[in-house]
């Protein structure tokens, strides 16, 4: 849902030659804004590293350390190489969700193109990791444990794997877009009484959706690392 007042209106004009819709242009604009924001925060946090962290370094160490602990608890030590990917996706989704709570800003995750792009990254990473780890034996993940059921299981597994990016993208898009719609309705009905509780609910929804997306990404990659039986 597009806010009545947008912060980066000029992007619509900039992207007009590409015939991109207004909602798509807004999503692109705010996606780049979030990328720049995360880069600036990372540069500030790592500019002058200290043995005893303070300020932004301390905050980012807590955030990144929390994500790292979750990766280790879910995937074990073999999940460490995939921590940068999972942490980047988690932070991007979280900030994308939260930015919609600022008046005049649009959450890119309320646009299906953005959520689909993130889901495709997870989908491709899962199978690239699986092929890199197991080689051609990775195909055994799709065959099932009983050889004479392999053709049927292969078909079922293919459908299951193709449904993963669909469910990942639609879940995040549906929740964030639905929240935007509900927020707009309540703002129209009671602009002075409802905003605060709705904003608090928005923060909760933003964190939950980022957590669910990160958790599913870890589970999918973890599954591709396991030996097929």
Swiss-Prot record:
It is found in: Cell inner membrane. It is a multi-pass membrane protein. Its main location: membrane. One of its GO terms (biological process) is proton motive force-driven plasma membrane ATP synthesis. It comes from Geobacter metallireducens (strain ATCC 53774 / DSM 7210 / GS-15). F-type ATPases have 2 components, CF(1) - the catalytic core - and CF(0) - the membrane proton channel. CF(1) has five subunits: alpha(3), beta(3), gamma(1), delta(1), epsilon(1). CF(0) has three main subunits: a(1), b(2) and c(9-12). The alpha and beta chains form an alternating ring which encloses part of the gamma chain. CF(1) is attached to CF(0) by a central stalk formed by the gamma and epsilon chains, while a peripheral stalk is formed by the delta and b chains. This is ATP synthase subunit a. Keywords: ATP synthesis, Cell inner membrane, Cell membrane, CF(0), Hydrogen ion transport, Ion transport, Membrane, Transmembrane, Transmembrane helix, Transport. Key component of the proton channel; it plays a direct role in the translocation of protons across the membrane. One of its GO terms (molecular function) is proton-transporting ATP synthase activity, rotational mechanism. GO terms for cellular component: plasma membrane; proton-transporting ATP synthase complex. Gene3D superfamilies: ATP synthase, F0 complex, subunit A. The gene is atpB. NCBIfam families: ATP_synt_6_or_A, PRK05815.2-3. InterPro entries: ATP_syn_F0_a_bact/chloroplast, ATP_synth_F0_asu, ATP_synth_F0_asu_AS, F0_ATP_A_sf. The chain crosses the membrane at residues 25-45, 86-106, 111-131, 142-162, 181-201, 202-222. It comes from the Bacteria.
């Amino acid at each position: 849902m597009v806010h009545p007042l947008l912060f980066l209106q000029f992007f619509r004009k900039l992207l007009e030659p590409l015939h991109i819709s207004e909602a798509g242009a807004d999503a692109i604009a705010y996606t780049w804004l979030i990328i720049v924001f995360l880069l600036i925060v990372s540069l500030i946090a790592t500019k002058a590293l200290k043995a005893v962290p303070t300020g932004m370094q301390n905050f980012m160490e807590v955030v990144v350390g929390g994500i790292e602990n979750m990766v280790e608890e879910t995937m074990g030590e073999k999940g460490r190489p995939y921590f940068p990917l999972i942490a980047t996706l988690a932070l991007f989704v979280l900030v994308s969700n939260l930015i919609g709570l600022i008046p005049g800003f649009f959450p890119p995750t309320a646009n299906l193109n953005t959520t689909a792009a993130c889901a495709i990254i997870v989908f491709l990473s899962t199978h690239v990791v699986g092929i890199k780890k197991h080689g051609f034996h990775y195909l055994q993940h799709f065959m099932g444990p009983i050889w004479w059921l392999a053709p049927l299981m292969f078909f079922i597994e293919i459908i299951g794997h193709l449904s993963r990016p669909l469910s990942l993208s639609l879940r995040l898009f549906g929740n964030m877009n639905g929240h935007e719609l509900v927020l707009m309705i309540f703002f129209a009905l009671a602009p002075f009484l409802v905003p605060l509780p709705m904003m608090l609910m928005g923060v909760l929804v933003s964190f939950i959706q980022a957590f669910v997306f990160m958790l599913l990404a870890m589970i999918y990659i973890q599954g591709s690392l396991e030996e097929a039986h």
